[in-house]
Swiss-Prot record:
Belongs to the RimM family. Keywords: Chaperone, Cytoplasm, Ribosome biogenesis, rRNA processing. This is Ribosome maturation factor RimM. One of its GO terms (molecular function) is ribosome binding. The lineage of its organism: Bacteria, Pseudomonadati, Bacteroidota, Cytophagia, Cytophagales. Coiled coil: none annotated. The PRC barrel domain binds ribosomal protein uS19. It comes from Amoebophilus asiaticus (strain 5a2). An accessory protein needed during the final step in the assembly of 30S ribosomal subunit, possibly for assembly of the head region. Essential for efficient processing of 16S rRNA. May be needed both before and after RbfA during the maturation of 16S rRNA. It has affinity for free ribosomal 30S subunits but not for 70S ribosomes. GO terms for biological process: ribosomal small subunit biogenesis; rRNA processing.
Amino acid sequence: MNKNCVEVGKITQARGLKGCVVARIEPILESFDPINYIFIKIGHTLVPYQVEEITGQAQQVFIKFQHISDRDSVRELIGSSIWLSQEILDKLVVQEEPYIDIIGYQVTDKYQGELGIIKDIEQFPLHVCLVVDYLDKELLIPYEPALIQDLDHEQKKIIVELPMGFLEAMGCK
């Protein structure tokens, strides 16, 4: 496997009759230009596929490959992971916000109440997490727009809506 590649998504289904696929993409990509090819993991090998067109936005995109023109040919790719070279990924990654400004903010869950103070920000390859002191444990909360309900810089508070069972899954309850 190529160590200079990063997994960025997964093919979830075929679309239409002309060899197009639907893919879920990590929310790190701002655009898809200029992608001429992607790698698809087949077995233990990354196989390059030439891209004719990528459309869509956010985390769901439609990919049309060159030289594939029927639904049956793409069915075997369903469930396969999508990889990009680090060089291409570096050109496409969304520019990071200055997260350092929110260290010290109080994090409150919409349903669970106060969780704690942000003591650090952890940057992982595909996302950013808030590090919060919660019941003498370190709680990692993904810094995702879908979870953030309100960000009040004046009062230094962040209101989040964590999924049901999140705290239990993190070993905090």
